[in-house]
Amino acid sequence: MKKVVNENQKSTLRKVLRYIRRYWGYLGASIILAAVTVALTLYLPILIGQAVDRIVGKGAVDFAGIFVILRKMAVIIGLTAVAQWVMNACNNKITYNVIRDIRTEAFEKIEKLPLKYLDAHSYGEIVSRVIADVDQFADGLLMGFTQFFTGIVTIFGTLIFMLTISVRIAVAVVVITPVSLFVASFIAKKTFSMFKLQSETRGEQTAFIEEMVGNQKVVQAFSHEDEALEKFDEINERLQKYSLRAIFFSSITNPSTRFVNSLVYATVGVVGAFTAIAGGISVGQLSSLLSYANQYTKPFNEISGVITELQNALACAGRVIELIEEDAEVPDAEDAVDLEHANGKVELSHVYFSYVPEQKLIEDFNLSVKPGQRVAIVGPTGCGKTTLINLLMRFYDMNSGTIKVSDIPLQQLTRKSLRDNYGMVLQETWLRSGSIRDNIAMGKPDATDEEIIAAAKASHAHGFIKRLPEGYDTVIAEDGGNLSQGQKQLLCIARVMLCLPPMLILDEATSSIDTRTEIKIQNAFAKMMQGRTSFIVAHRLSTIREADIILVMKDGSIIEQGNHEELLEKNGFYAKLYNSQFAKTS
């Protein structure tokens, strides 16, 4: 287990370094400036030692020499401040460029992920990786640049300056150093696994909170508050446990290294005092050595804290990099062509598909749709209606068989051009933040106001839009929170009305609309579907009576096929389903 964790940590670090290497210019400047800053800082104890010797040395106090030293110190302090400012600017540039790159790649990957990945992971957990985990990583990376590099340079620089004063004392310091390194290394291995668990649980908690907040009406309607709170408490307890363990191991790093570093300071003081008494060094040089001992041990204390932050940062980076490295949707074939304008002909031949290998869903599915035909798909929940739509849009690839559009197999078409030829209105509405005008024009950004208004009128959305205070300029809240479900659905229909592609998919498109509005929408749909191949998924059979073909599906297969009158005459599954829905009105 330890070996696996260590390998994961190293692998993540290598991947992070690949991002950092893109900005080698800033990195090189930062390292050089760190060396300059440390060199200037370490020169100060030399000057202080010289000043001490001019005060405690034989004869009168050398005030002139002291003033010269003070002027040098003032210049050095000023240069150090400037160098540190520029170094921090370089570090910030590296950190936030890397964060930008990682977030961009993560978002690009999300848009390329196959639907099966998005179906298997909650969107809250994915958002947590891109936002919270990247923020945690940024904090650790910035601290790593600002303190880790400077600390390392300070350690080696201090030893060099100490060697110029007393080789024996410098060697004594080097002998004690490995103890501090061993302590920090031992604890670092313990903290990484805990921070990884903490990060994963934080993502789980974020996903759960977003799920509950987004569906609070349903939670309250079913009196599910106690169960939700119990589940949240369980996740929260685990997060607390992992957080405490991570903090426990990280908290003992600093005291442990401080103890070892105190030994270093004491060693320099004792050995230096005896050396000064013996005449090996002056009092001023002893003062310089004690200052160096303090500066030498200080980075170990800081680095121990940095290591803790880096453990957390690497754990978080591992989660977002894991997302970036997920297999993307199977790319278009190299010889794939664009479907310029579909003629509406669709053929499915011996199509097989399953989400899970051992559970067959679509089996030996065959269908031939002529241009302009309206195809309705009905059946019980789980029969494969939405799955069939997913295959037509190539959100999923079939296991075997052939699907052709305009006599061209889907695999020979680019996904974008295929999907551009479909207009979709789904049961689940999605509106982006922005004005109503922007949402309607989503598929046609260059649409004129006249075109947008015409589309809204065709979908019967114009009336409620004009009643809003800002009309078409009304800004929609997140996911259309300030609109009713029916109003959101009307805007989604208007969006398709504006583009009017050659083929349409209506998946429970009127499920959230009242009966009165539904009649108007059906008339609008009838006009919209004229001359366009249309696939209509519906539970309410009143919406599909005018379809050219009605497919009755069960367990992934077509069990009945025909128009409304033909299926009623067969007195089969469709007839029973239809009669059950209209029993009260008959």
Task: Kindly label every feature range from the protein language model.
Residues 332-333, 339-586:
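ABC-type nucleotide-binding domain
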Residues 75-79, 178, 209, 259, ...:
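Hydrophobic transmembrane alpha-helices
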Residues 1-41, 56-73, 87-91, 95, ...:
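Membrane-integrated ABC transporters
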Residues 224, 248, 265, 295-323:
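Cytosolic ends of transmembrane helices, especially the final helix of ABC transmembrane type-1 domains
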Residues 17, 25-46, 69, 73, ...:
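Alpha-helical segments in transporter systems
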Residues 17, 115-116, 132-141, 145, ...:
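An intracellular "coupling" helix at the cytosolic face of ABC transporter transmembrane type-1 domains
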Residues 22, 26-39, 43, 50, ...:
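Transmembrane helices of ABC transporter permease
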Residues 2-6, 96, 104-128, 132-134, ...:
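Short intracellular "coupling" helices and adjacent cytoplasmic loop segments at the cytosolic face
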